[in-house]
Amino acid sequence: EEEEDPFEYEDSDDEMVASDGGSFQEDSDEEGEESLENQYYSAKSIKEDDLDAALELFAKIKDQVEGGEGDKQKVWKFKSLKQLMKIHYQLNHMDDLMKLYKELLNMNDYIEDKNYFLSSLVKIIDRYGKSNNPEFLEKFIELPLAHPSYLNDKLFIKLNIAKLNFLEGKN
Protein backbone atom coordinates (compact mmCIF):
# COMPACT_ATOMS: atom_id res chain seq x y z
CA GLU A 1 0.00 0.00 0.00
CA GLU A 2 1.32 3.44 -1.00
CA GLU A 3 1.91 5.89 1.85
CA GLU A 4 -0.08 9.11 1.42
CA ASP A 5 2.03 12.24 1.08
CA PRO A 6 0.82 14.83 3.64
CA PHE A 7 1.62 17.60 1.15
CA GLU A 8 0.17 18.08 -2.25
CA TYR A 9 1.80 20.53 -4.64
CA GLU A 10 -0.53 22.88 -6.46
CA ASP A 11 1.22 24.31 -9.50
CA SER A 12 -1.04 27.32 -9.93
CA ASP A 13 -0.46 28.75 -6.46
CA ASP A 14 3.20 27.90 -5.86
CA GLU A 15 2.08 26.70 -2.44
CA MET A 16 2.42 23.44 -0.64
CA VAL A 17 -1.00 22.37 0.59
CA ALA A 18 -1.18 20.18 3.68
CA SER A 19 -3.68 17.31 3.75
CA ASP A 20 -5.60 19.16 6.48
CA GLY A 21 -6.20 22.09 4.11
CA GLY A 22 -3.52 24.35 5.59
CA SER A 23 -0.77 25.64 3.37
CA PHE A 24 2.87 26.50 3.49
CA GLN A 25 4.29 29.21 1.25
CA GLU A 26 7.10 27.88 -0.86
CA ASP A 27 8.46 31.31 -1.80
CA SER A 28 10.47 33.21 0.75
CA ASP A 29 10.84 36.98 0.39
CA GLU A 30 14.13 36.46 -1.44
CA GLU A 31 12.62 33.95 -3.85
CA GLY A 32 9.68 36.28 -4.44
CA GLU A 33 12.02 39.16 -5.13
CA GLU A 34 14.08 37.01 -7.50
CA SER A 35 10.91 36.00 -9.33
CA LEU A 36 9.85 39.65 -9.67
CA GLU A 37 13.31 40.55 -10.90
CA ASN A 38 13.17 37.79 -13.54
CA GLN A 39 9.70 38.90 -14.63
CA TYR A 40 10.86 42.52 -14.83
CA TYR A 41 13.84 41.75 -17.07
CA SER A 42 11.73 39.43 -19.24
CA ALA A 43 9.21 42.22 -19.75
CA LYS A 44 11.96 44.72 -20.46
CA SER A 45 13.54 42.42 -23.04
CA ILE A 46 10.32 42.19 -25.08
CA LYS A 47 9.41 45.88 -24.79
CA GLU A 48 11.01 46.85 -28.11
CA ASP A 49 9.25 44.10 -30.06
CA ASP A 50 5.84 43.86 -28.39
CA LEU A 51 4.57 46.85 -26.39
CA ASP A 52 1.25 45.18 -25.55
CA ALA A 53 2.90 42.07 -24.10
CA ALA A 54 5.36 44.24 -22.16
CA LEU A 55 2.45 46.32 -20.80
CA GLU A 56 0.78 43.14 -19.56
CA LEU A 57 3.94 41.82 -17.90
CA PHE A 58 4.85 45.10 -16.19
CA ALA A 59 1.25 45.50 -15.00
CA LYS A 60 1.36 41.95 -13.61
CA ILE A 61 4.48 42.80 -11.59
CA LYS A 62 2.85 45.99 -10.33
CA ASP A 63 -0.26 44.09 -9.29
CA GLN A 64 1.71 41.31 -7.57
CA VAL A 65 3.30 43.85 -5.24
CA GLU A 66 0.02 45.63 -4.36
CA GLY A 67 -0.32 44.02 -0.95
CA GLY A 68 1.86 44.28 2.11
CA GLU A 69 4.91 42.51 0.73
CA GLY A 70 8.39 43.48 1.80
CA ASP A 71 9.84 46.83 0.86
CA LYS A 72 12.55 45.17 -1.25
CA GLN A 73 9.84 43.87 -3.57
CA LYS A 74 8.38 47.37 -3.87
CA VAL A 75 11.46 48.38 -5.88
CA TRP A 76 10.29 46.07 -8.67
CA LYS A 77 6.88 47.70 -8.59
CA PHE A 78 8.55 51.12 -8.78
CA LYS A 79 10.71 50.03 -11.73
CA SER A 80 7.68 48.51 -13.45
CA LEU A 81 5.71 51.73 -12.97
CA LYS A 82 8.52 53.65 -14.68
CA GLN A 83 8.48 51.22 -17.62
CA LEU A 84 4.69 51.36 -17.85
CA MET A 85 4.90 55.15 -17.97
CA LYS A 86 7.40 54.98 -20.85
CA ILE A 87 5.16 52.66 -22.84
CA HIS A 88 2.03 54.73 -22.25
CA TYR A 89 3.95 57.84 -23.31
CA GLN A 90 5.01 56.08 -26.53
CA LEU A 91 1.38 55.11 -27.15
CA ASN A 92 0.21 58.64 -26.28
CA HIS A 93 -1.98 57.33 -23.43
CA MET A 94 -1.50 60.37 -21.24
CA ASP A 95 -4.36 59.66 -18.81
CA ASP A 96 -2.91 56.21 -18.08
CA LEU A 97 0.54 57.73 -17.69
CA MET A 98 -0.79 60.25 -15.14
CA LYS A 99 -2.44 57.49 -13.06
CA LEU A 100 0.86 55.62 -12.98
CA TYR A 101 2.78 58.81 -12.17
CA LYS A 102 0.53 59.43 -9.17
CA GLU A 103 1.02 55.84 -8.01
CA LEU A 104 4.78 56.16 -8.46
CA LEU A 105 4.88 59.37 -6.41
CA ASN A 106 2.94 57.64 -3.65
CA MET A 107 5.70 55.03 -3.39
CA ASN A 108 8.04 57.58 -1.81
CA ASP A 109 7.71 55.97 1.63
CA TYR A 110 8.45 52.46 0.33
CA ILE A 111 11.68 53.13 -1.54
CA GLU A 112 14.51 52.80 0.96
CA ASP A 113 17.09 54.54 -1.22
CA LYS A 114 15.76 58.12 -1.36
CA ASN A 115 18.52 59.17 -3.76
CA TYR A 116 17.32 56.52 -6.21
CA PHE A 117 13.73 57.74 -5.84
CA LEU A 118 14.69 61.39 -6.33
CA SER A 119 17.07 60.76 -9.24
CA SER A 120 14.32 58.72 -10.90
CA LEU A 121 11.95 61.65 -10.50
CA VAL A 122 14.50 64.00 -12.07
CA LYS A 123 14.77 61.68 -15.09
CA ILE A 124 10.98 61.37 -15.32
CA ILE A 125 10.57 65.15 -15.20
CA ASP A 126 13.28 65.58 -17.85
CA ARG A 127 11.67 62.96 -20.10
CA TYR A 128 8.02 63.98 -19.92
CA GLY A 129 8.47 67.66 -19.12
CA LYS A 130 9.23 68.25 -22.80
CA SER A 131 5.82 67.11 -23.98
CA ASN A 132 4.05 69.24 -26.58
CA ASN A 133 0.69 68.45 -24.98
CA PRO A 134 -0.11 71.52 -22.82
CA GLU A 135 -2.98 69.86 -20.93
CA PHE A 136 -0.80 66.89 -19.99
CA LEU A 137 2.19 69.08 -19.18
CA GLU A 138 0.24 71.24 -16.76
CA LYS A 139 -1.08 68.20 -14.86
CA PHE A 140 2.33 66.55 -14.98
CA ILE A 141 4.05 69.55 -13.36
CA GLU A 142 1.31 70.29 -10.84
CA LEU A 143 0.97 66.76 -9.44
CA PRO A 144 4.29 66.59 -7.55
CA LEU A 145 4.10 70.28 -6.62
CA ALA A 146 0.86 69.49 -4.80
CA HIS A 147 2.87 67.08 -2.60
CA PRO A 148 6.10 68.95 -1.75
CA SER A 149 7.05 66.32 0.85
CA TYR A 150 7.99 64.06 -2.10
CA LEU A 151 10.51 66.58 -3.36
CA ASN A 152 13.93 67.78 -2.38
CA ASP A 153 14.96 71.39 -3.06
CA LYS A 154 16.47 70.54 -6.45
CA LEU A 155 13.27 68.89 -7.69
CA PHE A 156 11.07 71.62 -6.26
CA ILE A 157 13.10 74.27 -8.13
CA LYS A 158 13.24 72.16 -11.31
CA LEU A 159 9.45 71.74 -11.31
CA ASN A 160 8.84 75.42 -10.63
CA ILE A 161 11.14 76.38 -13.52
CA ALA A 162 9.25 73.93 -15.74
CA LYS A 163 6.01 75.50 -14.55
CA LEU A 164 7.30 79.01 -15.33
CA ASN A 165 8.44 77.89 -18.79
CA PHE A 166 5.06 76.30 -19.37
CA LEU A 167 3.19 79.42 -18.28
CA GLU A 168 5.48 81.64 -20.35
CA GLY A 169 4.90 79.49 -23.43
CA LYS A 170 1.17 79.56 -22.79
CA ASN A 171 1.06 83.38 -23.10
Predicted features and spans:
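Extended alpha-helical scaffold regions
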Residues: 1-171
